[in-house]
């Protein structure tokens, strides 16, 4: 049997990015044949990726890229906040954001099929899963292409904003993007707030007003007032500017001779149900299963 040297392990690790112990095991199994060991590792990493691919990804990052007249915002998910800080994961997320901006894929499936590093985006993603041992997924993206200006803002890589705007001052775009990250509006103006959100708010207001015991006409006014207040709170233009509580965003934009055409806001894991492991329940289930054997 061929002797497995440290230099052989290092060479295999450099080629595959696999953990040192995995490289040594593969070389041992391949009797020192580097090419065969590399093939074995790729199979093992693929299997590892397959096992991880079914696990919930509620952590992750938001990445952005702006180049020329296009900009993109992407959300990539992983399983733990530890991996969300991994250099390889972060580098992959930035690459994906750039691909979205420059290649204009129609959806996540089209993005995954784009060429990358001599393979495809999805193949690189699977290799990353094999390397870090956690599921990694590209959840969503948005792309703006415009003759206007584009600003982006990332808050700790967990909140991301992209804004299309007009105006001479770039600081305006940065300020608006930062404000959106802080105040999380759901629409540009009151007229843009989705009808289902308004209906929900109206039902809640009606239930609260009905409990007041006041006359119907007063109740109706209370409901309308609550809905109008809600619309102001969740529409960007009506919100109070976080850097100047004497101005609304609309007033700030007017003073700067600027306008906002549209924006997108991503919050990592938004809407994903994160698995909460119950250790006691897991042990109880294992004990019960053992008794049935």
Swiss-Prot record:
Cellular compartment(s): Cytoplasm
Organism name: Burkholderia cenocepacia (strain HI2424)
Predominant localisation class: cytoplasm
Top-level taxon in the UniProt lineage: Bacteria
Protein name: Elongation factor Ts
Record's function text: Associates with the EF-Tu.GDP complex and induces the exchange of GDP to GTP. It remains bound to the aminoacyl-tRNA.EF-Tu.GTP complex up to the GTP hydrolysis stage on the ribosome.
Chain intervals for the UniProt region annotation (Involved in Mg(2+) ion dislocation from EF-Tu): 80-83
Homology family: Belongs to the EF-Ts family.
Keyword vocabulary terms for this entry: Cytoplasm, Elongation factor, Protein biosynthesis
Cellular component, GO annotation: cytoplasm
Pfam families (alphabetical): EF_TS
Record gene name: tsf
